[in-house]
Regions:
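Beta1/beta-strand and adjacent pyrophosphate-binding region of the FAD-binding site
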Residues: 37-53, 71
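Glycine-rich FAD pyrophosphate-binding loop
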Residues: 63-85
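Conserved redox-cofactor binding core of oxidoreductases
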Residues: 126-236, 257-258, 305-307, 443-463
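A glycine-rich dinucleotide-binding beta-alpha-beta segment and adjacent secondary-structure elements
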Residues: 215, 224, 431-510, 595-598
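Glycine-rich loop(s) and the adjacent beta-strand/alpha-helix scaffold that form part
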Residues: 233-309, 521, 527-530
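An anion/pyrophosphate-binding glycine-rich loop and adjacent beta-alpha core
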Residues: 282-284, 291-424
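Structured beta-strand/loop patches that form or line metal/cofactor-binding pockets in enzymes
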Residues: 450-480, 548-593, 597
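Active-site- and interface-proximal helix/loop "cap" or "latch" segments in soluble metabolic
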Residues: 559-647
Length: 647
């Protein structure tokens, strides 16, 4: 046996895994066992990768056996841990237990034309409905809470269904979120922070950072995975034995350009998620003969987001999805417009309905692509999203609301004339001038004759200076990996289990085609827990019933009931600057909310603001839905009012 294992280790498994492996710390004693391997550390359950799937698995394993030795090993530093879950939209989907079959129908429809086994999708739909009470209890125990992603408690019907033309799209569900207890509002990175808090408070979970997993160790006769080889932060190489199994929760290959070219067939694509996902788990899985699936797909429905790449960050920013000014357009490699720039593609994760199918936007084929705008947009709109992407959520870069800092850095090109701007972009000045002139002419006509852009979103590009930023096709994560069953066990090409090897999260996801917002983070939790349950032979009994209100139902509370009568000035720090609201309260009820100063800085129109105010007055509470098209700004208003009256 010694000879067989050593051959596997030295030859068959000589691959590099740069994702999610942890150091053992000081004082570790090495032992040599009957299998002929010198083990430097021995644990019961080893988790490779510390994102949402890995954290969920560790917490579930600790619930099952508080005495089990659980080691989570992570490639990134502690400050940059969390995987793509920390850079995501922070939503997980919860279907009603009474409507699981309808939701299952929707899941199956989204996975066409690349269906997964029906028993898999059926299991997933049921887990999404069942796991909410475990999540709720887990968060209650560590100072966090589950609520609606738009603020306040969960409410049926609050979920935005992205593909309403598919069978099952009328399922009953809600968009759930995790935030600090009693905060009542959206929390950036909330899911990750909540599960990180749950994991770090458990004494039998060890988390090691800045360590590299370089091999799986496998018994070639039984095919069982015995453990891993890792290099620690100080450069030492160690062998870690995992008696009950190894879970690979180390993400996809979005930061491996060669894999992108090989599997997606793209020339150039970047990521707005963690820079740590470079396909290392995929290499390990392929080396041991795991059956691979979904290698072309990614978590954003296969649609590429519009990224802004800058020299200072590995990951991209995300181009803003809406703008107050319409003085912008995008051009392709020939300097011409190539699609309708103003549609709400982000509501279908950057897909467009064409020929009766949800297809990718054409940016990858149109490269290079540039976003051109004028001084009006520059001064009034942030070019990038202020709440999405790794540089913002994790590396905490604050993009200036008027883009001035980024112009100064040279990230955004600036020129006094369109012709000068074209030269800086590398285009023929006549080509860009012709495109701008045609666009401006259609603004005068009140109709986009080329691509049907809503004239309400079109403003002349005429107020110099003029600006341009290059657009890079961007994704958050890939979903390819090994095929896994509902126990999160990795399968070979004969659909047989590879013993003691598990997989969860993005790596080998069940998402094979379209992606509904919230499905992926829900799967990370479900698959991570399934791996722990299989490896440790049990299931957590931790549970706490969560209250989910019916659509239109209130929580029978009034936020303003204890507020003294009076008129208050509430300062709002919005997406594009500060503005002041006048809030009048009489007899414990809010009677008026209006903009007193700084209306030009408010990133929502009058109709959207009126809808938000009406919701607050109708419920006499801040537990209201955010407004479509102004989600972040409505949340800023709700948070600021809440903070003002509770400080």
């Amino acid at each position: 046996m010694k000879k067989i294992i050593s051959k596997v280790f030295a030859g068959l498994l000589a691959i590099t895994c740069l994702v999610g492996c942890g150091s053992t710390g000081t004082g570790t004693t090495s032992t040599t066992t009957d299998d002929g391997i010198k083990w430097d550390k021995e644990v019961d359950f080893l988790v490779v990768g510390y994102g949402l799937a890995g954290a969920s698995a560790a917490v579930e394993a600790s619930d099952i056996d508080p005495n089990a030795k659980i080691l989570v090993i992570e490639k990134m530093s502690e400050e940059l841990a969390g995987g793509n879950s920390i850079a995501s939209g922070q939503t997980f989907v919860v279907p009603s237990k009474d409507d699981v079959e309808t939701f299952h129908t929707y899941l199956k429809a989204m996975n066409e034309p690349n269906p997964i086994p029906e028993e898999y999708s059926s299991w997933l739909a049921q887990e999404y409905a069942d796991q909410i009470n475990w999540i709720n209890a887990t968060m209650e125990n560590c100072g966090y809470e589950v609520g609606y992603v738009g603020g306040g408690p969960l409410r049926w019907g609050s979920l935005v269904v992205e593909f309403g033309n598919l069978p099952g799209a009328d399922f009953k569900g809600t968009s759930a979120h995790i935030r600090k207890k009693d905060s009542g509002s959206f929390m950036a990175g909330g899911l990750w922070h909540g599960f990180n808090a749950a994991a770090t408070q458990r004494e039998n979970i060890e988390i090691s950072y800045r360590t590299t997993c370089i091999d799986l160790i496998q018994d070639v006769e039984t095919r069982a995975i015995l453990g891993v080889v890792a290099t620690t932060a100080d450069g030492s190489t160690i062998n870690i034995k995992a008696n009950k199994g190894v879970l690979l929760a180390c993400g996809g290959y979005e930061n491996n350009l060669q894999m992108q070219r090989d599997f997606h067939g793209v020339d150039n694509v970047r990521t707005s998620g963690t820079p740590g996902n470079t396909g290392d788990g995929i290499q390990m899985l392929m080396k041991i003969g795991a059956q691979m699936w979904h290698m072309k797909n990614q978590t954003q429905s296969g649609g590429y987001w519009l990224g802004v790449a800058v020299p200072d960050f590995e990951s991209t920013f995300i181009l803003n999805m809406t703008f107050k000014s319409g003085s912008y357009l995008q051009v392709d490699a020939q300097g011409e417009r190539f699609y309708n720039e103003s549609k709400t593609y982000h509501r279908q994760h950057m897909k467009d309905l064409k020929y009766g199918k949800w297809l990718d936007l054409p940016h990858e084929e149109a490269l290079p692509v540039w976003f051109i705008f004028d001084e009006t947009l520059r001064a009034g709109d942030s070019v990038v999203s202020p709440w999405l992407s790794w540089p913002i959520t994790t590396e905490h870069y604050a993009w200036s609301s008027d883009n001035s800092a980024e112009v100064e850095k040279g990230w955004i090109l600036k020129a006094d004339t369109i012709e000068e701007l074209a030269e800086k972009m590398g285009y023929e000045p006549e080509a860009i001038r012709a495109t701008i002139d045609r666009y401006n002419g259609m603004v005068d006509k009140g109709v986009d004759e080329d691509f049907g852009r809503d004239p309400e979103t079109m403003t002349k590009i005429e107020n110099g200076p003029f600006y341009a930023v290059e657009i890079t096709p961007t994704l958050v994560a890939t979903t390819g990996g090994a095929k896994r069953n509902t126990k999160s066990q990795v399968l070979d090409w004969n659909d047989e289990v590879i013993p003691n090897l598990y997989e969860a999260g993005e790596l080998g996801s069940y998402v094979s085609n379209l992606y509904q917002n919230g499905v992926f983070l829900s799967e990370a939790i479900a698959s991570g827990r399934a791996a722990a349950q299989t490896a440790l032979g049990g299931k957590s009994t931790v549970t706490s019933e969560v209250t989910i209100l019916e659509a239109g139902e209130t929580a029978n509370t009034s936020f303003f009931k204890d507020v003294k009568d009076g008129t208050y000035e509430v300062q709002i720090t919005g997406q594009h600057g500060e503005f002041t609201l006048e809030v009048k309260v009489a007899q414990g009820k809010v009677s008026l909310i209006q903009v007193e100063d700084g209306a030009d800085n408010m990133f929502m129109d009058e109709e959207q603001f009126a809808a938000l105010v009406n919701s607050i007055r109708e419920k006499q509470d801040l537990d209201v839905d955010t407004i479509s098209g102004a989600t972040q700004e409505s949340q800023n208003v709700l948070d600021s009012i809440r903070d003002y009256f509770t400080k």
